Amino acid sequence: MRILSLLFLLLLGFLAGNRVVSATDHGKTTDVTWDRYSLSVKGERLFVFSGEFHYQRLPVPEMWLDVFQKLRANGFNAISVYFFWGYHSASEGEFDFETGAHNIQRLFDYAKEAGIYVIARAGPYCNAETTAGGYALWAANGQMGNERTSDDAYYAKWRPWILEVGKIIAANQITNGGPVILNQHENELQETSYEADNTLVVYMKQIARVFQEAGIVVPSSHNEKGMRAVSWSTDHHDVGGAVNIYGLDSYPGGLSCTNPSSGFNLVRTYYQWFQNSSYTQPEYLPEFEGGWFQPWGGHDYDTCATELSPEFADVYYKNNIGSRVTLQNIYMVFGGTNWGHSAAPVVYTSYDYSAPLRETREIRDKLKQTKLIGLFTRVSSDLLKTHMEGNGTGYTSDSSIYTWALHNPDTNAGFYVLAHKTSSSRSVTEFSLNVTTSAGAISIPDIQLDGRQSKIIVTDYQFGKSSALLYSSAEVLTYANLDVDVLVLYLNVGQKGLFVFKDERSKLSFQTYGNTNVTASVSSHGTQYIYTQAEGVTAVKFSNGVLAYLLDKESAWNFFAPPTTSNPQVAPDEHILVQGPYLVRGVTINHDTVEIIGDNANTTSLEVYAGNLRVKVVKWNGKAIKSRRTAYGSLVGRAPGAEDARISPPSLDSWSAQDTLPDIQPDYDDSRWTVCNKTASVNAVPLLSLPVLYSGDYGYHAGTKVYRGRFDGRNVTGANVTVQNGVASGWAAWLNGQFVGGVAGAIDLAVTSAVLSFNSSLLHDRDNVLTVVTDYTGHDQNSVRPKGTQNPRGILGATLIGGGKFTSWRIQGNAGGEKNIDPVRGPINEGGLYGERMGWHLPGYKAPRSAAKSSPLDGISGAEGRFYTTTFTLKLDRDLDVPIGLQLGAPAGTQAVVQVFMNGYQFGHYLPHIGPQSLFPFPPGVINNRGENTLAISMWALTDAGAKLDQVELVAYGKYRSGFDFNQDWGYLQPQWKDNRRQYA
């Protein structure tokens, strides 16, 4: 098997090698260049270790910096970012890039401050499980014609968006001192015809021109949607529209959320794919599985054990390295929240994604394991120019082990990526590995792989000007060139390690500090240093000056290499080494003091190797800690945690309740509502009745809609109503104030119909009112039939049964429609419930004395609606990060639509009859961790059985003493209630 694969790969390498030019710069800038090996920034090769981050899903700019610091600390040097058109444009011609979390300049500034690059992805179409795939909702009603083509109507709508956002991206390119290094065109757009006049080709050329007009000069990129086609590569049928850097999206896990035994099947054909599709370009995975989304009725993310497993990161991400990938973006690295009505119907409120960084911004073990790879790629410069020697099962003494073999042609460095051939295997296997080194062919003995484990074995690996490994069976975590060369290796507890220094023929003396016993054995190619990994940290000081840290995996998870530079490209002499705490955000060295900013849940050991004997004092979050110097030069002490903090979220006892569906009453004054009087729609989806009742045709897009249809006569026996508001969405109807039916919603139905029966006793001779209230779970993405993002929302058709016609229809949605009356929270935060329109969810609103003293636990007895409000105060310590959430519960069988508002932000859409989510976290800035908070809950029943909750409780997640500034005034993000809301009754 090895011979066949090696011959094939050598043939591909020969063909590619004769077609390659190096250091391509596309004529626009030399700050970012590329060749078939890697991207280069400012003349230095870069392993792009990136994570996907969507600022829309975290509407607190200060928390972006929190996330970026955590990513930087855990080995990432870049983020990939979607810019959603719909988040910034409430109406045609209007763009908001300044208000609150719409201020994307702050995104770029924080990225630069944290020391991470940005890959910009502005669409115009994004997908991303966000409503309408990121399109502006005002445009997603059919007026764009044939979307994602060269259609003139479509071009006229998206061009202003790309120009406006493109100018801001351009101003933040690396050429202008900013962090942007790549700019993506469109998203997963499959090239279906290699013809220059094809509409997709013309469309991609249009995008390129508009981005260029906006001033973009960094290389362009695109992301192929899996191995289904080859699209927009200059190396494959380039007839126009091709980008500079071709990329392939891959979500290969095939995992079951609740069955860890299923799936876990590696893809081992990436290298061949890229050699065929983009042989002059570096291998780029713009979206590689960092988790997976869950649908309505699916699973809670915290129960997805397989996706959350650090084993996934270990095996899959190292397999990518073995495939010679040098640009990798983890989708998602932090998912965040589909707050407001930002979700597409395929997902619920949480967008946790089982990502390495939890929705609550807490670090999962998966991120800790990912860090081991990120820190390794950061210092392993020889990895950035390798040839594929071969792959297969012939490199080891056990045919159950699969090997990727990479070699750097300039330095002879080798990287052997090992995993079980059957990647889902749970077997523990011990074997020897045959490698090629500068000292000749060598068999490295006693390598052990646990089940679902991967290792990168290095040979001829330089870790200092005069320090190198001939080989090591332990994995390299990182190294530092300080006063001495410091090498950091890791293994699982109980695994055997063996390493040999290059060009060190004589046996070195050494001293060991820790629980791991190291012995030396002279061989024909140098002295072997042999050990079995014990728990904890062991330091070994060699007589050649090298200091080696030997870590077990759990200790490696808490090992950091914080940079002393803000440059995303960190040289081995531009970081120090810290072991022990939960998080190290940053370090500075001032004279004799090393100042560390970090977080800790519990008090931990703290070991700092700064490489400078003048450094005698360690400060943790501004306070000096007691420390001592070890015999090998580090400083050790204790970093305080939060175990002493008493966290008791207040109970929610004092509620006010008001009717949030007064508009179901026949005498309700709807004279200021929007009249539905259109007889034709720009939407291509056929009408089921007249007038047009598509909510988007009247400027109401997100959230609940309320319709009131009038008719005369007592002979009507019912109505046939069809509604489309996304899967899982329900609706209910009232005739002259009395409930007459509806649909509770289902996870497999976006369009629902019901025949409503009218009791003749409810009818009047004139002016009967049928009120229909519809829930909303988002606009569809492009792939959903029949028309994707244009699939209309609201009532598709309504006809009377038994004779007669509706004489009029009126609609009410979010207050102001497209006017965007709350620009801070934006156009997709609210819907059309009366309480929302009146602003009862906003801070500063005071319920009148007439409001009932009732809570969601009391609920409602029939098909009604209530809006509940209360306030509470949090007094967390100023240096504490304590994510807070709201736990809801409802009696079995409850069918209702529940929304949660925290300080005006809709941060929970709870459907107890569908699920799965019942716990809703709030980030600092949405919730005031040191101040008063306004909590509102809207609830309306989908049946005449009524609805109530049986649990409404604030809960704390973890608690962390932090050096981040959580003691902030979030008032600018929480505009107060104003009495002008009354005009939207």
Curated annotation (Swiss-Prot):
SUPFAM superfamilies: (Trans)glycosidases, Beta-galactosidase LacA, domain 3, Galactose-binding domain-like, Glycosyl hydrolase domain. It catalyses: Hydrolysis of terminal non-reducing beta-D-galactose residues in beta-D-galactosides. GO terms for molecular function: beta-galactosidase activity. It is found in: Secreted. GO terms for biological process: polysaccharide catabolic process. Residues 1-23 form the signal peptide. Pfam families: BetaGal_ABD2 (PF13364), BetaGal_dom2 (PF10435), BetaGal_dom3 (PF13363), Glyco_hydro_35 (PF01301). The keyword Hydrolase applies. Cleaves beta-linked terminal galactosyl residues from gangliosides, glycoproteins, and glycosaminoglycans. This is Probable beta-galactosidase C. It comes from Aspergillus clavatus (strain ATCC 1007 / CBS 513.65 / DSM 816 / NCTC 3887 / NRRL 1 / QM 1276 / 107).
